[in-house]
């Protein structure tokens, strides 16, 4: 395997046995691709904005004299970049400009004669843009649009599984779901009549819709039934025989023909009888006259002579009717073929309950059902029905819907119209009747072939279309009203409805969520989440068990592990590692093609529908060198079931062992040894890990760490290869390799790093360079680590030395005992950044003022403020300190004569303002790391604002000029090369000032041209620099666009350092979570024979019942990894020669059959080996991929190599007594995470605070400064102890007895500790509620 310079710094030993056929795809592509489709110009007009415009335009006036046509659109440049939008609290968006053409036709002239054409570009609002990391910045906060899993449009056949009717009869139904428009349902009732519902309203007989489609009774019967033909000959009744129809019937008379009896009366007709009849080619048989009674006539029969209707279609025949028919000369009678087995009389029966008899009455009936209470007219009824399913404006199946519809009805073509046709409706009814007759199956709604993904782009397009449709109405009216000669397109269009619809979607849709930004993994998982909730989806309450359950089609598409615990379980899922969506929005997963029993490296993506037709082997099937299966029988999946197949039956093979799981679950080593429930907790808890002060890569990983860290976008990744030319804490400059440069550019890439910014969850985002000056880098190398990444690998926690043993009850019930060393070394110290804002408004009594001159506040309280009244950066503040001084004018109060006198003597006192300063919340203390002042346009900036502005300008100028210098240096080195090649002496050239170089002329024309080109570039560079600086200056100095009535906003950022302490929640990666019970002194911790104490003591009883054995294997393997690191460390300390080091490290990498990754250290230089050793001295990182991990024997081998006991257990000694513990203890290294459930955020105590308005009881919860609820069970406890007075106190003065508690407060202040309980307010509430029921109830005082 070839490693780049940066990758050679630290290589993970990989235990994976299966070769990596397909690299992990870019993990955010589901978001980025979908949005790209939405905004990029699509010439076909299938997707995105283009499709939305084409579906609404052209808009014609009601008279048809004019129309507004759409030509094209373009997105402008965003005003602010992403960072500026976050700081200013605005939306990162681009203006949408649309070119429209207004065409006016001549009124009197023949059709289509154009009178006037006007074309103009019109502004149509702002479209939020996606950042490079798949998020949106809306009002300054990063949000994610979660993809939705919804029912695909199309037709679905289902049954109620016998739950509706008491008899348990299974009722079948069909439902046509369009992408937009009315739903059409067909359903059977218990009497086997077929009904139709439109939009889930009341049901009508299904034949009404056929009559509305202009079918007569005869035509309807013709469509759905085969005919039985009777002929009357010589007063005998004969029937045309179709032998196949007789199968399974019992003969009610002798079946004979040509004097031969084929079946005797009462006998059952078998296949043998039918063969006999067919062989003798029997066409007609004689039947008794009674046989025809009860048969149903297939068409109208009229008496030719009188014109009288003898019997209408769908009437039952009786012997009298037969006689009448015979008399009037009808010798041939067509009846419907029905039987109880597989040709039910459903449509015939339905026609009998159908009240309508022609098209108009059917349309009226449908109109009455859709619009009850409105008087129907013919036109209204016709247009309503037409608009329901046959109008492109109101109804659209979409390409997906049409494809699913045609596939479901087994049609050849998969494309077609977006509206329904007569055939569509009839075919659906036919198939439903077939299913009722026992032919065909119902659909499985939870099958992923029937559910599709709706991603950002599609949802934004739908929202945009909604806005456009609103605009369409207004445009139509304007086209009809106005004087068209003077109007321009922009007078027609009002952009408000469009931007309102888009804004509403991005700002407040259920699927537009505040991004979970705890750590890089939680960001990535949030963007790959798939929700079944949201508009057009399910609701938590209605979702049953089946929808939430794991379905066989989830394999490789949706993760069976990662889903929230609680009410949303199974409704919110995560995309599997390799899954992607196809053009129709269905999830697909990759497989390797198997041809003639040989597994190839050809990759095919299959959707759930296609997968059902193949036999697919698992990824861990053993193959030989050529790719043949080793075993004769291979475990495979086919049609959702797993079983053994012979090797030549296999069609495909899984791509990778981690194909089944999501990114979160693929980061859990030894996942295959954990119980599923615990794995779920492990995957979910990794997302809650807080980035530690110094990230520490996991010793035992799965090899997915690098992919997650790079794709999450928190690291700085090299866009092109080159050499590091400059590096400091906030910038990295790369001189690009010659072969990767664009022609005529300076070849310098500058990466500005993010420093100490706040994430959505108040954790700290900070990037630190991990390359040094002069190092070569390649494209895709990590240049700087972000939060929770270490050398470009995801590092959510710390490697801790753990021991599994009880310790004095401090690890009872999942508690965790932690050594003081962990606190001292700041292993789990985290930085949290809080944003506190102070808003100065314009009030009725005058403007609020931000100032240091605050009434009734001592000097000490103002010591941290500057003269503008704003805290200075670097100040250490604690709860209650003033951060921003602000005074609010208060209403004039009536002054007493004494006050008036004092005022007159001492002048104007500051009593007409009240202190409304921003203070640090209680329980928070930290350091001020940044202050930002935003001032409204036209309001004078204070001194602090001007200082900040000046500083920003200085910084911007410094950044830009440094950038310019770097680019200039690159350019001049190329100019020098051209000059020297053109014959100028290098020494003389270096004596000449650089600016004069461009004045030199060369004789060689080609070189002279090159020189002139470079000179042009130089001028352009300087011009560009001036332009950038001017733009920056304008942005910095312009006023801010603040909300109405707001004059100034001051934002103060506090950095809070949180050390680990009892009460904090910690967890491993296997769902093994617990709370810290005690921080133990180092000297009291158990230690080994070398005197090394353990860091954490965990309870062994937490493992067997939970069945997450993965943690034990991880501990052993971690121990081995550390042991090897220790040996390398010892060798480095002894300064042994490189050859020995190289040999030992090579041995470690070669251990276990590494097919996937042969690390060949012979290709490394000595310096590279030394640097690798330096990075391995704390432990050799190991990858053990999911379902393909290290085996027990391999772990033992590795332990042996690290000179450690192969049992993984060692003798420990009690730190307090020095005595050896009775038995050996499992000790090793486990990766522990500190979760974002910190005791500091949860600890809370209430003094007198706010009360609920109605019940007058204290509020609940920390955010409301609430009290602790003394609930029903606590009352029982006091009752049980007979503590009557305590109980009375709890229910009255400590809760909602308003007078009692006020009096009590006064008494306490006076030092009188007595109480008089009164009437609790909740009793009065109860009285009022009873009175509201009309029962007067009064409390009489005795």
Curated annotation (Swiss-Prot):
Summarize the subunit comment: The RNAP catalytic core consists of 2 alpha, 1 beta, 1 beta' and 1 omega subunit. When a sigma factor is associated with the core the holoenzyme is formed, which can initiate transcription.
> PANTHER family in the record, alphabetically?
DNA-DIRECTED RNA POLYMERASE I SUBUNIT 2
| EC code(s) of this entry | 2.7.7.6
Catalytic activity entry: RNA(n) + a ribonucleoside 5'-triphosphate = RNA(n+1) + diphosphate
Record PTM N6-acetyllysine, positions in chain: 1022, 1200
Q: Name one GO cellular component term.
A: DNA-directed RNA polymerase complex
Q: Which GO terms describe its molecular function?
A: DNA binding; DNA-directed RNA polymerase activity; ribonucleoside binding
Q: Which UniProt keywords apply?
A: Acetylation, DNA-directed RNA polymerase, Nucleotidyltransferase, Transcription, Transferase
Which chain regions cross the lipid bilayer? none
Q: Does the keyword Ribosomal protein apply?
A: no
Protein name per Swiss-Prot or TrEMBL? DNA-directed RNA polymerase subunit beta
Record-level GO BP terms = DNA-templated transcription
Q: Which domain of life is it from?
A: Bacteria
Organism phylogeny: Bacteria, Pseudomonadati, Pseudomonadota, Gammaproteobacteria, Enterobacterales
Q: Explain the purpose of this protein.
A: DNA-dependent RNA polymerase catalyzes the transcription of DNA into RNA using the four ribonucleoside triphosphates as substrates.
Protein family (similarity comment)? Belongs to the RNA polymerase beta chain family.
Does the record carry Lipid metabolism as a key word?
no
């Amino acid at each position: 395997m070839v490693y780049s310079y940066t990758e050679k710094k630290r290589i993970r030993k990989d235990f994976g046995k299966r070769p990596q056929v397909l690299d992990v795809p870019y993990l955010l592509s589901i978001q980025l691709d979908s949005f790209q489709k939405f905004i990029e110009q699509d010439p076909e007009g299938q997707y995105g904005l283009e499709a939305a415009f084409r579906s609404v335009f052209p808009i014609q006036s009601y008279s048809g004299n004019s129309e507004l046509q759409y030509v094209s659109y373009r997105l402008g440049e965003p005003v602010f970049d992403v960072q500026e939008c976050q700081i200013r609290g605005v939306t990162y968006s681009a203006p949408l400009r649309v070119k429209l053409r207004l065409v006016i036709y001549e009124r009197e002239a023949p059709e289509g004669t154009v009178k006037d054409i006007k074309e103009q570009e019109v502004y149509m609002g702002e479209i939020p843009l996606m950042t490079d990391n798949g998020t949106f910045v809306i009002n300054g906060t990063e949000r994610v649009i979660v993809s939705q899993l919804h029912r695909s449009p199309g037709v679905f056949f289902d049954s109620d599984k016998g739950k509706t009717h008491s008899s348990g009869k299974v009722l079948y139904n069909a439902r046509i779901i369009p992408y937009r428009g009315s739903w059409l349902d067909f359903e059977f009732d218990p009497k086997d009549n077929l009904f139709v519902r439109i939009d889930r309203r009341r049901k009508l007989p299904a034949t009404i819709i056929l009559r509305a489609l202009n079918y007569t009774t005869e035509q309807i019967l013709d469509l759905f039934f085969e005919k039985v033909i009777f002929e009357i000959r010589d007063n005998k009744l004969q029937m045309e025989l179709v032998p196949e129809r007789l199968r399974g019937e019992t003969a009610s008379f002798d079946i004979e023909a040509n004097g031969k009896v084929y079946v005797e009366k009462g006998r059952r007709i078998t296949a043998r009888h039918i063969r006999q009849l067919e062989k003798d080619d029997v066409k007609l048989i004689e039947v008794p006259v009674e046989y025809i009674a009860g048969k149903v006539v297939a068409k109208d029969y009229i008496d030719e002579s009188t014109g009288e209707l003898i019997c209408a279609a769908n009437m039952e025949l009786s012997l009298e009717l037969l006689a009448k028919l015979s008399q009037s000369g009808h010798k041939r009678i067509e009846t419907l073929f029905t039987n109880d087995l597989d040709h039910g009389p459903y449509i015939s029966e339905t026609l009998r309950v159908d009240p309508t008899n022609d098209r108009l009455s059917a349309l009226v009936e449908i109109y009455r059902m859709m619009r009850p209470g409105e008087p129907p007219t013919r036109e209204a009824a016709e247009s309503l029905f037409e608009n329901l399913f046959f109008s492109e404006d109101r109804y659209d199946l979409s390409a997906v819907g049409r494809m699913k519809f045609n596939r479901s009805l087994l049609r050849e073509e998969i494309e077609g119209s977006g509206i329904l046709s007569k055939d569509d409706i009839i075919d659906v009814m036919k198939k439903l009747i077939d299913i009722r007759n026992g032919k065909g199956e119902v659909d499985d709604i939870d099958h992923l072939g029937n559910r599709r993904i709706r991603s950002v782009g599609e949802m934004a397009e739908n929202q945009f279309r909604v806005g456009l449709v609103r605009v369409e109405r207004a445009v139509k009216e304007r086209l009809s009203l106005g004087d068209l000669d003077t109007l321009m397109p922009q007078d027609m269009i009002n952009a408000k409805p469009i931007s309102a619809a888009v804004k509403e979607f991005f700002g407040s849709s259920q699927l537009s969520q505040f991004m979970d930004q705890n750590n890089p993994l939680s960001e990535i998982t949030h963007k790959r989440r798939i929700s079944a909730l949201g508009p057009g989806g399910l609701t938590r309450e209605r979702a049953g068990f089946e929808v939430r359950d794991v379905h066989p089609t989830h394999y490789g598409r949706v993760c069976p592990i990662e889903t929230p615990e609680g009410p949303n379980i199974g409704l919110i899922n995560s995309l599997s590692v390799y899954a992607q969506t196809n053009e129709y929005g269905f999830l697909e997963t990759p497989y390797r093609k198997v041809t003639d029993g040989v597994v190839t490296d050809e990759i095919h993506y299959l959707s759930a529908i296609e997968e059902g037709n193949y036999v697919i082997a698992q990824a861990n099937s053993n193959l030989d060198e050529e790719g043949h299966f080793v075993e004769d029988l291979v475990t495979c999946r086919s049609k959702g079931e797993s079983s053994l197949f012979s090797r030549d039956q296999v069609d495909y093979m899984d791509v990778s062992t981690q194909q089944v799981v999501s990114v979160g679950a693929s980061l859990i080593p030894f996942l295959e040894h954990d119980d599923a429930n615990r794995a779920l907790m492990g995957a979910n808890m990794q997302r809650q890990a807080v980035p530690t002060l110094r990230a520490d890569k996991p010793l035992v990983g799965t090899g997915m760490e690098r992919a997650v860290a790079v794709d999450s976008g928190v690291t700085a990744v090299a866009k092109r290869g080159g050499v590091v030319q400059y590096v400091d804490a906030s910038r990295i400059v790369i001189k690009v390799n010659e072969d990767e440069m664009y022609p005529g550019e300076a070849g310098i890439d500058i990466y500005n790093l993010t420093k100490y910014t706040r994430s959505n969850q108040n954790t700290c985002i900070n990037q630190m360079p991990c390359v040094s000056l002069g190092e070569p880098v390649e494209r895709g190398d990590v240049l700087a680590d972000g939060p929770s990444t270490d050398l470009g690998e995801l590092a959510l926690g710390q490697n801790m030395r753990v021991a599994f043993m009880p310790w004095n009850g401090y690890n009872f019930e999942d508690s965790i005992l932690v050594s003081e060393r962990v606190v001292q070394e700041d292993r789990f110290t985290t930085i949290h950044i809080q944003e506190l804002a102070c808003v100065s408004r314009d009030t009725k009594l005058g403007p609020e003022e931000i100032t240091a001159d605050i009434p009734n506040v001592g000097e000490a309280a103002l010591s941290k403020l500057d003269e503008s009244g704003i805290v200075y950066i670097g100040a250490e503040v604690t709860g209650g300190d003033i951060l921003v001084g602000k005074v609010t004018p208060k209403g004039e109060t009536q002054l007493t004569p004494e006050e008036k006198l004092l005022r007159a003597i001492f002048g104007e006192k500051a009593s007409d303002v009240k202190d409304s300063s921003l203070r640090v919340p209680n329980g928070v203390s930290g350091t001020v790391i940044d202050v930002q002042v935003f001032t409204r346009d036209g309001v004078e900036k204070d001194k602090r604002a001007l200082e900040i502005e000046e500083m920003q300008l200085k910084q911007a100028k410094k950044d830009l000029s440094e950038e310019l210098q770097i680019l200039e240096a690159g350019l001049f080195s190329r100019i020098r090369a051209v000059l020297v090649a053109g014959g100028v002496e290098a020494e003389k050239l270096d004596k000449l000032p650089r600016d004069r170089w461009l004045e030199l002329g060369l004789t060689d024309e080609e070189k002279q041209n090159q020189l002139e080109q470079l000179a042009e570039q130089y001028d352009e560079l300087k011009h560009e620099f001036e332009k950038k600086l001017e733009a920056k200056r304008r942005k910095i100095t312009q006023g801010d666009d603040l909300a109405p009535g707001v004059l100034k906003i001051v934002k103060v950022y506090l950095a809070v350092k949180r050390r680990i302490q009892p009460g904090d929640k910690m967890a491993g990666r296997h769902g093994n979570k617990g709370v810290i019970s005690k921080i133990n002194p180092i000297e009291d911790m158990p230690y080994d024979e070398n005197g090394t104490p353990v860091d954490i003591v965990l309870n062994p009883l937490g493992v067997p019942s939970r069945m997450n054995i993965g943690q034990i294997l991880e501990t052993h393997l971690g121990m081995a990894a550390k042991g090897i690191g220790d040996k390398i460390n010892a060798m480095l300390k002894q300064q042994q020669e490189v050859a020995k080091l190289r040999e030992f490290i090579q041995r470690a990498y070669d251990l276990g059959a590494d097919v996937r990754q042969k690390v060949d250290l012979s290709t490394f230089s000595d310096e590279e080996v030394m640097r690798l050793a330096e990075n391995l001295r704390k432990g050799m990182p190991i990858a053990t991929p999911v379902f393909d991990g290290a085996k027990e024997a391999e772990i033992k081998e590795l332990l042996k190599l690290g000179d450690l006991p192969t049992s993984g257990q060692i003798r420990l000694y009690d730190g307090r007594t020095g005595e050896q513990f009775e038995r050996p203890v499992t000790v090793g290294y486990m990766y522990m995470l500190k979760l974002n459930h910190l005791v500091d955020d949860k600890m809370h105590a209430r003094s007198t605070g706010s009360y609920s308005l109605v019940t007058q009881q204290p509020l609940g919860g920390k955010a409301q400064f609430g009290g602790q609820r003394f609930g029903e069970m606590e009352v029982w406890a006091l009752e049980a102890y007979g503590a009557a007075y305590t109980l009375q106190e709890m229910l009255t003065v400590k809760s909602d007895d308003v007078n009692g508690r006020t009096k009590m407060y006064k008494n306490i202040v006076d030092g009188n500790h007595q109480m008089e309980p009164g009437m609790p307010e909740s009793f009065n509430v109860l009285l009022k509620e009873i009175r509201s029921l009309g029962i007067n109830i009064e409390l009489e005082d005795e």
